[in-house]
């Protein structure tokens, strides 16, 4: 009798051990760590059931959970409450493609968000970034990883004329304090894909709150209008500086102008003057629009580029993030 009980106990323990291991492996499969010896970064991987982000606003790929260089940190949770389906439960340099065919689509019919999939228009109101539009087809994601890179590929084959292969590769450059995001959008459908994409750049450098220790330096002298401009922040030459700490509410500069038509002006530096570190952001495509948003826990230049791919064609672009100290 004792032998039987011992045998059953061993089976129960073994089964529990297997379950625990399976669960931990599945959890581990949703994130990956990469390094080039200078920069260390952790990325969350896309998954419709258990992914960190399951909202319908931002591109699901390339979500960087944390990044450190030379003893400094650049990405952390900036929002108060986490919910995988909330539109802003994202971190780091996240991209959003503007919706395609939303305005011409009747309620109950589908529209496209590149990097998310085919979604359903749920009411007559204008498109809202905070609204959850019911997914119809989220496509198929494939992920490849290496020591210093993660490659994300989404394949979408829809019934509404839009199909594509979208690839984003996040790479830590060997021997440099540099991160590159390279993109390819291959139009495999019948309709032209024409939209804008921007990078929200949810940075929080060394956990410094928005205030006089934070500044953004542009490649041109910016001008613009918006909420908080003049009392909380102001333009000083080619810089955007904080006049005081941002304790509540937000800053929203809807339109920043002054840039030229070449990629040279898609360059800015986000700096923490207190800890003497910063991030330089560049792109190989020209700006189509530029905004700036901030709350007390993050400061976000929002640069847009135009994306255009006719059927059978491919559109490419690349962001470069360089981390530095002084």
Language model: regions and residue ranges:
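Hydrophobic h-region of N-terminal signal peptides that target proteins for export
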Residues: 13-23
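Compositionally biased, low-structure terminal segments
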Residues: 8, 16-18, 59
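Bacterial N-terminal signal peptides that target proteins for export
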Residues: 2-10
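Surface-exposed acidic/polar loop and edge beta-strand patches at domain peripheries
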Residues: 25-174, 178-180, 188-194, 200-326
């Amino acid at each position: 009798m004792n032998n039987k009980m011992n045998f059953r106990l061993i089976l129960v323990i073994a089964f529990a051990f297997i379950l625990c291991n399976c669960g931990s492996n599945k959890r581990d499969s949703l994130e990956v760590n990469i390094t080039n010896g200078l920069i260390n970064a952790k990325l969350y991987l896309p998954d419709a059931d258990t992914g960190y982000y399951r909202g319908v606003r931002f591109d699901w790929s390339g979500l960087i959970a944390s990044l450190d260089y030379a003893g400094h940190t650049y990405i952390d949770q900036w929002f108060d409450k986490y919910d995988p389906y909330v539109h802003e439960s994202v971190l780091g340099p996240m991209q959003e493609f503007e919706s395609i065919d939303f305005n011409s689509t009747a309620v109950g019919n589908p529209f496209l968000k590149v990097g998310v999939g085919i979604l359903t228009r749920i009411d007559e109101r204008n498109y809202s970034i905070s609204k959850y539009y019911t997914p119809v087809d989220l496509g198929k994601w494939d992920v490849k990883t290496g020591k210093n890179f993660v490659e994300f590929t989404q394949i979408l084959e829809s019934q509404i004329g839009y199909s594509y292969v979208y690839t984003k590769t996040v790479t830590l450059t060997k021997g440099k304090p540099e991160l590159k995001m390279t993109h390819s959008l291959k139009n495999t459908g019948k309709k032209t894909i024409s939209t804008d994409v921007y990078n929200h750049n949810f940075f929080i450098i060394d956990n410094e709150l928005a205030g006089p220790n934070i500044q953004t330096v542009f490649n041109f002298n910016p001008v613009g209008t918006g909420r908080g401009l003049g009392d909380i922040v102001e333009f000083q030459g080619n810089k955007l500086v904080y006049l005081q700490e941002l304790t509540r509410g937000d800053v929203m500069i809807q339109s920043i102008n002054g840039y030229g038509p070449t990629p040279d002006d898609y360059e800015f530096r986000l700096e923490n003057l207190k800890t003497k570190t910063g991030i330089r952001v560049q792109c190989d495509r020209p700006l189509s629009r530029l905004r700036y948003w901030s709350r007390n826990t993050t400061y976000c230049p929002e640069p847009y580029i135009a994306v255009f791919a006719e059927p059978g064609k491919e559109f490419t672009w690349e962001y470069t993030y360089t981390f530095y100290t002084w």
